[in-house]
Amino acid sequence: MTTPHKKVSPKAPVLAADACPRCGTTMKEAHGVLRLPVNGEDVAVPHAAHLRCPKCKEVVLRLEDARRLGEDAIAIYRKKHGLLSAGDIRAIRERFELTQGDLAKLLHLGQNTVSRWESGRNVQTAAMDVLLRLLRDVPGSLEYLRSHAA
C-alpha cells in the first residue's frame, strides 16, 4: 500500500529579514514619533525605534520595539490623565504586603489585570485609580475592602 503524496503548492518568494514587506527594499533603522491608540485616544510616543523603508516609507516594528512602544504609550497616557504609574500601583500593593492575587480579590478583578497594570501593559480605569488611591491614602480602607471582598 502506498501513501498518497500531498500536492505541494508553489511557495511565495521569501523576503530577507530586513526587507520591506510592501516593496522588498532593505529597511533602515529609524527613531521618531509614532502614534498608538490607548483607550480610544491617539498617543504620540517620541523617539520610538522602528524600521522604515526608504522607498515606500512603510513602518515595521520589531517585537521588542512594539512592546516598548505599547508600554511607553500607556505611561504617557497615565501621566497625561494623572493616573498612578505602574510603579505606584506596585508600591501600594507591596506597602500592604499583598500579592497580586490578594489585590485583585480586594478590587474584584482578575489577577492578570493587576499584573498587566504593574508591568505597564494595560492602564487602569479612572475609577480603579481612585480606589487604589483610597487604599493608599485613607486609613481603614484595606480593612473595609477585606470585609467586602468576594
Name each model feature, range by range.
Residues 61-127:
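Extended interfacial segments that mediate partner engagement and assembly in macromolecular machines
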Residues 2-6, 11-83, 137-150:
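N-terminal flexible/basic segments that precede or flank functional cores
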Residues 1-2, 112:
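Intrinsically disordered/low-complexity terminal segments and short unstructured peptides
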